[in-house]
From Swiss-Prot:
<dbReference type="Pfam" id="PF02545">
    <property type="entry name" value="Maf"/>
</dbReference>
<dbReference type="InterPro" id="IPR003697">
    <property type="entry name" value="Maf-like"/>
</dbReference>
<feature type="active site" description="Proton acceptor">
    <location>
        <position position="87"/>
    </location>
</feature>
<feature type="site" description="Important for substrate specificity">
    <location>
        <position position="175"/>
    </location>
</feature>
<feature type="site" description="Important for substrate specificity">
    <location>
        <position position="88"/>
    </location>
</feature>
<dbReference type="GO" id="GO:0036221">
    <property type="term" value="F:UTP diphosphatase activity"/>
</dbReference>
<dbReference type="GO" id="GO:0036218">
    <property type="term" value="F:dTTP diphosphatase activity"/>
</dbReference>
<dbReference type="GO" id="GO:0005737">
    <property type="term" value="C:cytoplasm"/>
</dbReference>
<keyword id="KW-0963">Cytoplasm</keyword>
<comment type="function">
    <text>Nucleoside triphosphate pyrophosphatase that hydrolyzes dTTP and UTP. May have a dual role in cell division arrest and in preventing the incorporation of modified nucleotides into cellular nucleic acids.</text>
</comment>
<feature type="compositionally biased region" description="Polar residues">
    <location>
        <begin position="1"/>
        <end position="10"/>
    </location>
</feature>
<comment type="similarity">
    <text>Belongs to the Maf family. YhdE subfamily.</text>
</comment>
<feature type="region of interest" description="Disordered">
    <location>
        <begin position="1"/>
        <end position="20"/>
    </location>
</feature>
<dbReference type="GO" id="GO:0009117">
    <property type="term" value="P:nucleotide metabolic process"/>
</dbReference>
<dbReference type="InterPro" id="IPR029001">
    <property type="entry name" value="ITPase-like_fam"/>
</dbReference>
<feature type="site" description="Important for substrate specificity">
    <location>
        <position position="28"/>
    </location>
</feature>
<keyword id="KW-0378">Hydrolase</keyword>
């Protein structure tokens, strides 16, 4: 029987290619990976504290959380694995907007974002497990500028009623009803959804994998 690419062993006793593990419970990130033909071998939720530290700025926050997610899951793996972690932070200036868990928070976020520019910072991190010593730790941070038009109270009410703000940083989902109110985006659309696809593909292309198996993406 022919072994799968992630389990076929080379002369070193290690597989030609490690398992790819997505350290996220987000269906959006899984869907984005599948969009470019990448299907993780495992999807594991990273149970970490995502609260910003006192005085922590948006960029360092996104980077720290993405690293912690990847490192938390990588530390639990004893097999040859490469763990992909990501985190998205929405900010207005130096202010980090929360993930909206209730209507009051979502409404406050939308009122703040109405008619103004904000930034979406998405960090993506690759961390090898101890069982894949030749893996290369690497990461990218992608910054995207987004501008909402000026929202009326009725439009905010309609967005709240849609319900796709739940659990979203900044209280909206760009792939949902909010798209009708976004006047301009500068940067990576997929990063705003939750995973910058170009940068993620670049990181994966840079990983050392065996020639017989090839990488995850051309």
């Amino acid at each position: 029987m022919t072994a799968s690419p992630s389990s076929a062993e080379g002369s070193s006793g290690l597989p030609d290619r490690p398992k790819l593990v997505l350290a996220s419970a987000s269906p959006r990130r899984l869907s984005l990976l599948e969009q470019i033909g990448i299907v993780p071998d495992a999807v594991v939720s990273a149970d970490i504290d995502e609260e910003p530290r006192p005085g922590e700025l948006p960029r360092p926050l996104a980077q720290r959380l993405a690293r912690q997610k990847a490192e938390h899951v990588a530390a639990q793996r004893t097999d040859a694995a490469l763990v992909l972690g990501a985190d998205t932070v929405v900010s207005v200036g130096r202010r980090v907007l929360p993930k909206a868990e209730d209507e009051k928070t979502a409404r406050a976020c939308l009122k703040l974002l109405s008619g103004r520019r904000h930034k979406v910072l998405t960090a993506v991190v690759l961390r090898p497990s101890a069982g894949w010593p030749q893996g290369t730790p690497c990461e990218r941070l992608v910054e995207t500028s987004v501008i909402f038009h000026r929202l009326t109270d009725a439009q905010i009410d309609a967005l709240i009623a849609q319900g796709d703000w739940q659990g979203k940083a900044g209280g909206y989902a760009i792939q949902g009803a909010a798209a009708a109110h976004i006047r301009q985006i500068g940067g990576s659309y997929s990063a705003v959804v939750g995973l910058p696809l170009f940068e993620t593909a670049q990181l994966l292309r840079g990983q050392p994998v065996g020639k017989p198996s090839g990488g995850w993406i051309a």
